């Protein structure tokens, strides 16, 4: 229980190649570099969404495949929970914002109790204006992080939360990190929050652009009938 956790390996790349090109080779390299025996792992933590539809499908399919092959449980970490855990030990309200376009963000509202993440409001897709109103009701300092920061920082500072104490995470803590997902995975594993590989499904929070366009097309066709 009091054992100090250690990150053995973490592989991060934020460049042009796609998840489908990089994920399996990265996993393979980590296994080789650490001489890991896959049978010794207890569970597989996976960032289960929201996020890029393709990225989520690839990540979930990979975790599912490993879980089935190794007969190990999965720990589904909501992507914004994992992001929030980057800021462990802060005394501010933590608000990850991922750009969901159309003035919306994928977000959640959190605070830390020591090294334990507390979810004040679970992950959701909301307009940035509505999120700012929610945060103002807490009356506490807030720190934002995530790829929605460059998109919405100006409005948050100059329009939506001018009278509130807000801050923004530095670049090295501003993106999803495998180590944070892993550490939060340990907390959720101890709390019994696991699922079987068969049960796991990515959480998109809303339909993909392709599905939206299809629905709009069908509506238009019905109108013309």
Regions from the PLM with identified roles:
Residues 1-3, 7-12, 134, 207-210, ...:
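Patatin-like phospholipase
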Residues 1-48:
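N-terminal beta-alpha supersecondary unit
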């Amino acid at each position: 229980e009091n054992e100090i956790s250690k990150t053995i390996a973490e592989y991060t790349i934020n460049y042009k190649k796609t998840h489908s090109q990089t994920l399996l080779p990265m996993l393979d390299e980590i296994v080789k570099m650490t001489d890991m025996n896959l049978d010794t792992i207890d569970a597989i933590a996976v960032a289960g969404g929201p996020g890029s539809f393709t990225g989520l499908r690839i990540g979930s399919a990979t975790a599912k495949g490993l879980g089935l092959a190794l007969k190990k449980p999965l720990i589904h970490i909501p992507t914004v929970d994992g992001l929030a855990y980057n800021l462990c030990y802060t005394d501010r309200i933590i608000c990850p914002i991922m750009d969901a376009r159309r003035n919306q963000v994928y977000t959640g509202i959190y605070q830390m109790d020591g090294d334990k993440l507390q979810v004040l409001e679970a992950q959701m897709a909301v307009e940035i204006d509505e999120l700012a109103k929610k945060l103002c009701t807490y009356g506490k300092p807030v720190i934002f992080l995530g790829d929605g920061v460059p998109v919405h920082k100006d409005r948050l500072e100059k329009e939506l939360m001018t009278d509130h104490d807000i801050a923004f995470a530095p670049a090295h803590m501003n993106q999803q990190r495998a180590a944070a997902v892993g550490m939060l995975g340990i907390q959720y594993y101890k709390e019994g929050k696991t699922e079987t590989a068969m049960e796991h499904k990515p959480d998109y929070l809303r339909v993909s652009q392709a599905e939206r366009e299809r629905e709009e097309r069908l509506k238009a066709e019905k109108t013309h009938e």
